[in-house]
Amino acid sequence: RQRQMCIRDRYVIESYGLIVNKTLLEKAGYTVDDIKSFDDLKKVADDIQARKDELGVKGAFTSAGMDGSSDWRFKTHLANLPIYYEYQADGIDDTDAIKGTYLDNYKNVFDLYITDSTCDGAELSAKTADDSRNEFINGDAVFYQNGTWEYAELSKTFSDDELAMIPIYFGVDDENEGLATGTENYWCVNKNASDEDVQATLDFMNWCVTSEAGTKSMSEDMGFTIPFKTAVAPTNVFVKQDAEYTAAGLTPVSWNFTTMPSEEWKNGLGTALTLYAAGSGSWDDVVSAFVDNWATEKALSE
């Protein structure tokens, strides 16, 4: 649009949700079939948290780390859900003035993450993506918000039968909600590069999605779903589960990251969430960072 930017074909499709250690969940007396709504999730998570010593875990959820390696999970991925539901309710796909209709739901989920956690909220500012992943791998927590891209690492420790991914139930349309599935990944070629380099780049991109080695690497090694006719069937259990949710009639939550105003908006939201989790900021500050900064940053991008 105004920035004269063209986004055409995505080269990968991914999903995110709540990754579940089914073995630990069953040890607590539940299965994934017991969790079909936000209320169900809260009931199960609260119970696990109350019985964490008995169950041998440190918390229901892995740490919601807010350092730079991890905060995108909450200032972007989790923040996508209130945006998605507002867009759906208003019949739009972008806006210069987000209303924050579903920020109470955002709060409910984030509150669950920081109260039923492996650590105190004041510690989250220094918690990393590796911390969160390792807590899950070590059996310290039952739930771990992340995506299909985590499969390659988790499969080194867990069998497919021990893992599941469920939607981040938001308390809006839980009975119809699937995983958050989409992309923000596109290949671009610099037109100012030499003809030789442009052609070499195009040849490599073609190799990635047509050759046996390229498609295997992208599908199996990287855990991607690649939307090309030459794609091999995924071995990633989370990708398979996403397909099962869709086949069952559940609606994938679309990715609306490209409509977020700017990185500055995300960073401001991340800071407000971090302070809120630590008890030194209010939820009103989070709402302001979400709603007021959206309008400001959208205006600056025009």
What are these model-derived regions, one by one?
Residues 26, 50, 213, 232-234, ...:
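Conserved C-terminal helix/tail region of periplasmic/extracytoplasmic solute-binding proteins
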Residues 44-47, 90-126:
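Glycine-centered hinge/linker elements that transmit conformational signals in sensory
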Residues 65-68, 83-108, 156-157, 170-179, ...:
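Short, solvent-exposed loop/beta-turn-alpha elements that line the ligand-binding surface or hinge
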Residues 142-147, 164:
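Paired acidic/hydrophobic, glycine-rich loop segments that form the ligand-binding mouth/hinge
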Residues 8-11, 16, 42-95, 141:
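Extracytoplasmic/periplasmic solute-binding protein
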